[in-house]
């Protein structure tokens, strides 16, 4: 039987990023053959990734990449906020964003396939399920800028614009804070407007106001609704005395489009009863 030295284990750990004991076991199984041991670990890490696939990944980070006139914003999920802060996980998320910007995949499934080897490797290292949840690529003749909020990187935006990068970045910060649904009123679908109009009309009728006054009330509330959900109509968070459209115009800038994400939006997180888990473990 080949002797397994500490240096061999350390070298394999450096090459794979896996635990010392896992690397030692692989070297023993491979009878000291480094390449074979690395192959064994790759196979086992794939099995580990499959084993964890059913667990809910509701934490994570956002990452972006801008490659010339192509930009990508991605959300990559893991199971715990502890792993979400891990440098290796963040590096994986950045790799996913870079891959999305370079390859411009057509779907999450296609992007996931492109990064599957790296995903399995980081799962094997950190022991949590991870997944590419969503992404968007903007391929444009215009300019691009991104803003990721805070050290935890859980909210962010990719902005397509014309004009000043500094102004566009400030507007990106506004988008994260104020959460507009679209850039302008023209992008709000008619069905949404009519639904709101119906609600406001019924409320006005119920208030007993005369028809002409009720009609004016409805139109006023529709204007307010559109201002609240559109970027151009919102009061600019850095100067509420002007709208975002006014701030952009006076600084020679126009926002063409944007995509905004918040990690975990719409994912139902599992509620863990740790007391019950400890009690159950104590009976084993």
From Swiss-Prot:
Pfam families: EF_TS (PF00889). One of its GO terms (cellular component) is cytoplasm. It is found in: Cytoplasm. Residues 80-83 are annotated as: Involved in Mg(2+) ion dislocation from EF-Tu. Keywords: Cytoplasm, Elongation factor, Protein biosynthesis. GO terms for molecular function: translation elongation factor activity. CDD domains: UBA_EF-Ts. Belongs to the EF-Ts family. Associates with the EF-Tu.GDP complex and induces the exchange of GDP to GTP. It remains bound to the aminoacyl-tRNA.EF-Tu.GTP complex up to the GTP hydrolysis stage on the ribosome. This is Elongation factor Ts. It comes from Neisseria meningitidis serogroup C / serotype 2a (strain ATCC 700532 / DSM 15464 / FAM18). The gene is tsf.
């Amino acid at each position: 039987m080949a002797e397994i030295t500490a240096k061999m284990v350390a070298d394999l750990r450096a090459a794979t990023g896996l635990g010392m004991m896992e690397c030692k076991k692989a070297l023993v199984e491979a009878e000291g053959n480094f390449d074979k041991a690395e192959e064994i670990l790759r196979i086992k890490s794939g099995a580990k990734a499959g084993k964890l696939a059913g667990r809910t990944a509701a934490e994570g980070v956002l990452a972006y990449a801008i490659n010339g006139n192509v930009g990508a914003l991605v959300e990559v999920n893991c199971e715990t906020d502890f792993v979400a802060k891990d440098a290796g996980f963040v590096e994986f998320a950045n790799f996913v964003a870079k891959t999305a910007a370079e390859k411009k995949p057509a779907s999450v499934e296609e992007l996931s396939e492109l990064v599957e080897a790296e995903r399995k490797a980081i799962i094997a290292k950190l022991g949590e399920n991870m997944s590419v949840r969503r992404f968007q690529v903007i391929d444009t003749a215009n300019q691009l800028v991104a803003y990721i909020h805070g050290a935890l990187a859980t909210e962010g935006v990719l902005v397509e614009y014309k004009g000043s990068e500094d102004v566009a970045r400030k507007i990106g910060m506004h988008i994260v804070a104020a959460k507009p649904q679209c850039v302008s009123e023209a992008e709000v679908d008619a069905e949404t407007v009519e639904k709101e109009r119906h609600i406001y009309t019924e409320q006005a009728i119920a208030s007993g106001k005369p028809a002409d006054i009720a009609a004016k009330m409805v139109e006023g509330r529709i204007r307010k609704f559109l201002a609240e959900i559109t970027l151009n109509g919102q009061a600019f968070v850095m100067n509420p005395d002007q709208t975002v459209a006014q701030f952009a115009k006076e600084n020679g800038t126009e926002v063409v489009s944007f995509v905004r994400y918040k990690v975990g939006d719409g994912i139902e997180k599992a509620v863990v009863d740790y007391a019950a888990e400890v009690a159950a473990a104590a009976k084993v």
